[in-house]
């Protein structure tokens, strides 16, 4: 439960997301609405998905009035119903990509995702074509200054977490999906709202990108996918080498 962080690319993605706050808010609101509709309750205590969505929204500083409006709008018959879709494919150099989307128009979203893959040298595959390369799990992230490695490790284990990786930026806790809400609630009570929390896809192994040109091309694909309002999150199995990571961060 330690070692070189395979979550370094997550931090880079977060930096990119921070520059697109309005788009992030749109995605958070869409998840809140879907959580209420699919969970048949607008009460967080009775709806684990909504509870998780609200924690994520607060971690990104989504204003309370917008949260309340999203919850209330879910009961409105005129509010769009969103369909959950997962797309899978490959970026250049054999990098696996998983795209999770919430959409009110599947044809539009499929066209946008396929166009992004094609434009940047990737290929969109069938659902299930790459997910075997990932673990589907809950992810909770805290900045490293919130607690020591030892303390966060002990708290994560006590809460029911499965794995934790600490680096210079984040403590990243992974959990079984079934335990995600319980672990998130426990850690939130102990350390406050996390930097990020979600159910997603973590690579079982990573492919090291040690060429800046390849890294930049890969990021263009990922960023093009994230540009879509329908796309909630993008997951992949790449990791930048230290040298490439420093160069990419310097270009932000």
From Swiss-Prot:
This is Probable transcriptional regulatory protein A1C_04175. Pfam families: TACO1_YebC_N (PF20772), Transcrip_reg (PF01709). One of its GO terms (biological process) is regulation of DNA-templated transcription. Keywords: Cytoplasm, DNA-binding, Transcription, Transcription regulation. It comes from Rickettsia akari (strain Hartford). One of its GO terms (cellular component) is cytoplasm. The keyword Transcription applies. HAMAP family: Transcrip_reg_TACO1. The keyword Ion transport does not apply. It comes from the Bacteria. Its main location: cytoplasm. One of its GO terms (molecular function) is DNA binding. Belongs to the TACO1 family. Gene3D superfamilies: 1.10.10.200, 3.30.70.980. It is found in: Cytoplasm.
């Amino acid at each position: 439960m330690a070692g070189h962080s395979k979550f370094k690319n997550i931090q880079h993605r977060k930096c990119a997301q921070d520059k697109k706050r309005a788009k992030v808010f749109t995605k958070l609101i869409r998840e809140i609405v879907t959580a209420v509709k699919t969970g048949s309750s607008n009460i967080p205590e009775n709806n684990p998905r909504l509870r998780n969505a609200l924690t994520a929204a607060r971690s990104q500083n989504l204003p309370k009035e917008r949260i309340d409006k999203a919850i209330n709008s879910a009961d409105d018959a005129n509010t769009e119903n969103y369909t959950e879709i997962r797309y899978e494919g490959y970026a250049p150099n054999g990098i696996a990509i998983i795209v999770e989307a919430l959409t009110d128009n599947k044809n539009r979203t499929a066209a946008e995702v396929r166009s992004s893959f094609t434009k940047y040298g990737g290929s969109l595959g069938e659902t299930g074509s790459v997910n075997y390369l990932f673990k589907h799990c809950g992810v909770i992230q805290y900045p490293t200054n919130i607690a020591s490695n030892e303390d966060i490790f002990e708290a994560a284990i006590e809460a029911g977490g499965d794995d934790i990786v600490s680096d210079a930026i984040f403590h990243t806790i992974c959990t079984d999906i079934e335990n995600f809400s319980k672990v998130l609630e426990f850690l939130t009570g102990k350390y406050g709202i996390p930097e990020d929390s979600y159910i997603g896809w973590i690579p079982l192994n990573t492919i090291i990108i040690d060429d800046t040109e390849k890294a930049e091309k890969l990021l263009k694909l990922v960023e093009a996918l994230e540009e879509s309002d329908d796309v909630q999150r993008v997951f992949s199995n790449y990791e930048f080498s230290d040298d490439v990571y420093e160069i990419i961060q310097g270009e932000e």
